[in-house]
Amino acid sequence: MPLLNLVLDNGSRFVADVEKHSSIALWAPPEGGIEGNYQRRLRGIGYRTQIITAKGLGDISRFLLESHGVRPAHLGKKDKRVFTLPPELAIYMDTLPASAKGFVLWIIEGKVLSLFELESLVGLPAAVPKLKVIVEVGSDYNIRWMPLEQAVSKMAEGR
């Protein structure tokens, strides 16, 4: 019943947790819509946000931090080529205005990521200043979140 699912929090606890922990694991209702309130709240206090999907990323640390090759479909008519693209985070961080509080990388469909990939996302904000990472790792009836490091350790234990 998402229409009756009232959020008692106005987003301030979420923003405080994002600023404190820098990487957050999020569970949102599968119908969607509620997480947009939290994205709007982050943008309202000065963060820039970018939403990407976890499906098809490949090596996440290489995709975000290093130059990586992309092979377009050739359909048998052309030769096989590889285009080199710059790191995604470099593109976003270079265009970040000086007045911005930081940059939030919001990753949807994070349930397809392995524990190793989630662990690499935990350390990402320490490597890149002004970066916050939010990963939607599953769905739940109500929206809830916890530090990504804590969520990864619980997933590793099987809880």
From Swiss-Prot:
InterPro entries: NAD(P)H-quinone_OxRdtase_su_N (IPR020874). Its EC number is 7.1.1.-. It is an enzyme of class 7 (translocase). It catalyses: a plastoquinone + NADH + (n+1) H(+)(in) = a plastoquinol + NAD(+) + n H(+)(out); a plastoquinone + NADPH + (n+1) H(+)(in) = a plastoquinol + NADP(+) + n H(+)(out). Coiled coil: none annotated. Transmembrane segments: none annotated. Pfam families: NdhN (PF11909). GO terms for molecular function: oxidoreductase activity, acting on NAD(P)H, quinone or similar compound as acceptor; quinone binding. Its main location: membrane. It is found in: Cell inner membrane. It is a peripheral membrane protein. NDH-1 can be composed of about 15 different subunits; different subcomplexes with different compositions have been identified which probably have different functions. NDH-1 shuttles electrons from an unknown electron donor, via FMN and iron-sulfur (Fe-S) centers, to quinones in the respiratory and/or the photosynthetic chain. The immediate electron acceptor for the enzyme in this species is believed to be plastoquinone. Couples the redox reaction to proton translocation, and thus conserves the redox energy in a proton gradient. Cyanobacterial NDH-1 also plays a role in inorganic carbon-concentration. Belongs to the complex I NdhN subunit family. This is NAD(P)H-quinone oxidoreductase subunit N. It comes from Gloeobacter violaceus (strain ATCC 29082 / PCC 7421). The lineage of its organism: Bacteria, Bacillati, Cyanobacteriota, Cyanophyceae, Gloeobacterales.
